[in-house]
Amino acid sequence: MRHRKSGRQLNRNSSHRQAMFRNMAGSLVRHEIIKTTLPKAKELRRVVEPLITLAKTDSVANRRLAFARTRDNEIVAKLFNELGPRFASRAGGYTRILKCGFRAGDNAPMAYIELVDRAEPKAEAAAE
């Protein structure tokens, strides 16, 4: 029985799931928007939101915790130097999921997951 077991299995073993979400979290922090399937996007929220909350208070211990979860110094630097200060006044809810139709090959529901206060460089350039 799977009573009270949280999280989706996504037809992967635990090490594959952990590696996949570690990579996806890094991509989301790096690019601030990624396109993936809807169930993966909903699970990715559970990985990324605590990372950003951790980055709001900059300390060596928090940087080490973030590195243990992402294994990428570039991602840790962006979390603590850019995203932590950007979301300092926001109490959670750092990501947004936008549904974007279905994938052509297998009709899987697709979604964009993005950071809420994401800067849009194309819109700013067009306005000028």
From Swiss-Prot:
Organism the protein comes from: Klebsiella pneumoniae subsp. pneumoniae (strain ATCC 700721 / MGH 78578)
Alphabetized UniProt keyword annotations: Ribonucleoprotein, Ribosomal protein
GO MF annotation terms: structural constituent of ribosome
InterPro entries attached to this UniProt entry: Ribosomal_bL17, Ribosomal_bL17_CS, Ribosomal_bL17_sf
Name of the protein in question: Large ribosomal subunit protein bL17
GO biological process, one term: translation
Pfam family, one: Ribosomal_L17
One GO CC annotation: cytosolic large ribosomal subunit
Quaternary context: Part of the 50S ribosomal subunit. Contacts protein L32.
Protein family (similarity comment): Belongs to the bacterial ribosomal protein bL17 family.
Superkingdom of origin: Bacteria
PROSITE patterns: RIBOSOMAL_L17
